[in-house]
């Protein structure tokens, strides 16, 4: 697949697993490529995910194999376990910043401020205008889209198109449910995104420690 190739259409599990591989490559390099179990844990994280999923091991493994068939994932064998890494950047000819944005959008629709705050550990962006520049490039290639503002929304939101055409009404309804009871305003949105980023950092550190402990146990066996 290249810039002129058809975009693959992913189901919910495939999209979530691919997004996890993209994020964990940057945030927990010592535990990457991911095992099936690590991919399952990452896919079922509840922070800043829409929708929140509870995928079983077999579903995650099947999603990884299908992504491998699409060329978006490559399997590696090390430490006596299957491990998987993504190939999104090379397959679709994307920059690091564009891969990071796709990885974040695979969590669910987000605003520029949320993308900028959550991208801190994935890729370097100068500011939200820089984020917008890379998003515009993805939009031009049919990989992302800007969503119409729903009633009461103050900011534009963006979504990926790796799962085909968007059901805008369903996305807006899901966004409204997720935002119910939260304070409105861009400053609050960005602050919440930074808090969620810190929570994700703690989770990633726990993942890395668990991976290190597993390797130490294997070495001592």
Swiss-Prot record:
The organism of origin for this protein: Xanthomonas oryzae pv. oryzae (strain KACC10331 / KXO85)
PANTHER family xrefs: UPF0502 PROTEIN YCEH
UniProt xrefs under Pfam families: DUF480
UniProt similarity note: Belongs to the UPF0502 family.
Protein name: UPF0502 protein XOO0245
Database matches in InterPro entries: DUF480 (IPR007432), WH-like_DNA-bd_sf (IPR036388), WH_DNA-bd_sf (IPR036390)
């Amino acid at each position: 697949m290249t810039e002129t190739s058809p975009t693959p259409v992913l189901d919910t599990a495939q999209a979530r697993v691919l997004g996890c591989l993209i994020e964990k490559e940057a945030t927990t390099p010592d535990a990457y490529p991911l095992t099936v179990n690590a991919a399952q844990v990452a896919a079922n994280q509840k922070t800043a995910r829409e929708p929140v999923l509870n995928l079983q091991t077999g579903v995650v493994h099947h999603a990884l194999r299908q992504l491998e068939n699409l060329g978006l994932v490559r399997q590696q064998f090390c430490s006596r376990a299957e491990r998987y890494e993504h190939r999104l950047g090379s397959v679709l000819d994307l920059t690091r910043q564009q891969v990071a944005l796709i990885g974040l959008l695979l969590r669910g629709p987000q605003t520029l401020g949320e993308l900028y705050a959550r991208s801190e550990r994935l890729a370097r962006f100068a500011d939200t205008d820089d984020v917008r520049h890379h998003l515009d490039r993805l939009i031009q290639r049919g990989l992302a889209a800007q969503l119409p503002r729903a009633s009461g929304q103050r900011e534009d939101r963006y979504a990926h198109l790796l799962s085909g055409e968007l059901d805008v009404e369903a996305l807006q309804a899901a966004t409204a449910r997720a935002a119910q009871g939260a304070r409105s305003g861009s400053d609050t949105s960005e602050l919440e995104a930074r808090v969620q980023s810190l929570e994700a950092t703690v989770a990633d550190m726990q993942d890395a420690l668990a991976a290190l402990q597993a390797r130490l146990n294997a070495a001592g066996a």
